[in-house]
């Protein structure tokens, strides 16, 4: 199957594209886009991979689902398009960056600038029906994104994996802590941010680790 995804990822994920689950997933997603409103727009489904080639990945942040409101989702977890008000979790992420690094709250919630520096902003599920949170879960996306994380963790070294909340922590449970830095805390959602997200210093800790391993820090 010829999947429109960045070439280095295409090579590493090629076996997945031929598996039954992925063929069924593709048929389901194609049908959904033809019959109802799906986010993100189709050209952005694999944008997290397209902006962040396999060998350029320094950091992985794992999300769960794309935003399901109009104009929000554009294929990067937690990120929104320019001009879109910050969802609560993203607002809290920026507050923690401000507290941790002294950086001002940005004017845009578009995290493409992170992706361009090597931050893979990966949702576990890459599509969703408008206004129906979780509507494309358990259709095969989770298996596909598990494979992407597993291949990265096995074939690369010294990546920072950031796991916020129990869902992301379960998804990243197999990552070898001897080869990579795994940072885990509560989710930035208002429901849990005060239970361990605020004050986690994940952004400064990420940069310290990258610099200790000869890499350029991220401009958060």
Regions found by a protein language model. Name each.
Residues 1-13:
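Generic N-terminal amphipathic, Lys/Arg-enriched alpha-helix
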Residues 3, 15-160, 168-170, 175, ...:
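A polyanion-binding, active-site-adjacent surface
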Residues 197:
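C-terminal substrate-binding/active-site "lid" region of AdoMet-derived donor-dependent transferases
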